[in-house]
Amino acid sequence: MSEFLPQRDWTVIVGSGMAGLMAAMTLAPQPVLLVTRGALGGETSSAWAQGGIAASLGPDDRAALHVADTLAAGDGLCDEDMVVGIVSSAPAVIDALERAGVRFDRDAGGNYVFGLEAAHSRRRILHAEGDGSGAAIVRALTDAVRRTPSITVLEGTEVRRLLTEDSVIAGLACAGPNGSFLLPASQVILATGGLGGLYDATTNPSGNFGQGIMLAARAGAILADMEFVQFHPTALSSPRRPLALVSEAVRGEGALLLNENGERFMAAVPGAELASRDIVARAIDREILRGGQVFLDARQALGSGFASRFPSIDLLCREAGIDPARELVPVRPAVHYHMGGVATDNKGRSSVRGLWVAGETACTGLHGANRLASNSLLEAAAMGMRAAQDIAGRPAPAARSAAAVSPNATADFSPADLAAVRPIVSRHLGIVRHAAGLAEAIRDLLPLAERNGPASDPAVVALSIAVFAALRRESRGAHFRDDFSQKDAKAMRRRLSLNDVVTVAHEFSSSSLATAGFARSA
């Protein structure tokens, strides 16, 4: 390492999506250092979100209905207390966002305009600037952060490791434009987003491989429910990477899914085009595996009104040479969200002292086995705020000097390289899984994860998904195994440390998946 950044009594926030930005704003006027890999708010899934924020604020809606929809989508694995708490926090979240400068869409009478998305029983999705909601929200929050004197922003800086002393957070090993440095810190909030970049077909920023999960796991944090990876049913099918998302709000306005014969294949399924994402994604995947294409037909439902209702999607379609008002839109599933992550409590605390985690990096139990549409931005904002409030209510930690950082922290860490990992993950950890594929994934990923090379960090995250998936010998929510296609009578969440993951991986590598019996449950 080339230098130490001087010690300050600030809280360090890693990541500048919704969770990180809301945590920073909530902590003000306490000092915050916000560290972000790119530009503030840039290259974040939050900024790319076309959907809005689910909030049961409509005249025909109430929190209990939103809770019921969330529990149904989660397929038996939701933490009901977390669901009730986060859903009930929606009014406070919306108020905080509006005070920060977000302007949600309203009608001529000044009332909120609510959209409908899959598996919601009511129109309860709030948008800002239509299908550009994520960009509008993040833009308002980044402006607010830059206006706040207590927040220092460090852009273009990647955190390579969390440093601990006696299992307590002591600092961060970072790499920036001027080289590597150590950043002493005793309070860290990880909010680095998801892991879609592990897959070839994703709607996430391609560089997002689960950095926060890796950092926390290497620091000793417990992981939860890592097998649950959500595939959005309708990404625009094209050579573009990452794939462009076609929000399910389009289906909420009446667009239909057709196979290449022009047949509506979702009509007989409960919920039809607005069934939960796992069901729709598997149905589309089956059609594609039969050798066909799948199309979204918005011609009758929206027609010439498509561009005004969904300007961002209209532009993406036209860039691909498609006029969605007059033509069918080819779609395919793509990785969109990860329900698992670093296990946290209702205040965002991880199992490592001094480490809080919020947003998609965390696993709170809100989503269970399958996320309900537009609950992610709600959770990110709510848990960013909760983590900040928990830190703000604590006594100031004792200052740690650079000398307190462990001696092995002076080693440089290689930047991540996904080239060796992405093909394995895309082939074996997709929409449909089975024992042989999971065994091959574990066999190929384990040596990569145990080495110190550039593939090691993404391989740690990918191996965790594979091990959790191999241990779950049932199909539930977004996790589907064609060799265990039924759901167990008893729902069980699972929590493992990285040491547990590696131990299980070695067991699987030396024995049959069918007889391996290691399982640590929540």
Swiss-Prot record:
GO CC entries: cytoplasm
Top enzyme class: oxidoreductase
GO molecular function: L-aspartate oxidase activity; nucleotide binding
Signal peptide positions on this chain: none
UniProt-listed Enzyme Commission number(s): 1.4.3.16
UniProt cofactor note: Binds 1 FAD per subunit.
InterPro entries documented for this protein: FAD-dep_OxRdtase_2_FAD-bd, FAD/NAD-bd_sf, Fum_R/Succ_DH_flav-like_C_sf, Fum_Rdtase/Succ_DH_flav-like_C, NadB, Succ_DH/fumarate_Rdtase_cat_sf
Cofactor(s) annotated in UniProt: FAD
Active site, per annotation: 277
Pfam families xrefs: FAD_binding_2 (PF00890), Succ_DH_flav_C (PF02910)
Presence of the UniProt keyword Flavoprotein in the record: yes
Major subcellular location class: cytoplasm
Chain residues that bind FAD: 16-19, 45-52, 360, 376-377
Catalytic activity: L-aspartate + O2 = iminosuccinate + H2O2
Biological processes per GO annotation: 'de novo' NAD biosynthetic process from L-aspartate
Subcellular location(s) per record: Cytoplasm
Site-annotated residues for Important in orienting the L-aspartate substrate: 117
Pathway: Cofactor biosynthesis; NAD(+) biosynthesis; iminoaspartate from L-aspartate (oxidase route): step 1/1
Keywords: Cytoplasm, FAD, Flavoprotein, Nucleotide-binding, Oxidoreductase, Pyridine nucleotide biosynthesis
Function, in words: Catalyzes the oxidation of L-aspartate to iminoaspartate, the first step in the de novo biosynthesis of NAD(+).
Family: Belongs to the FAD-dependent oxidoreductase 2 family. NadB subfamily.
Protein name: L-aspartate oxidase
Organism per entry: Agrobacterium fabrum (strain C58 / ATCC 33970)
Gene: nadB
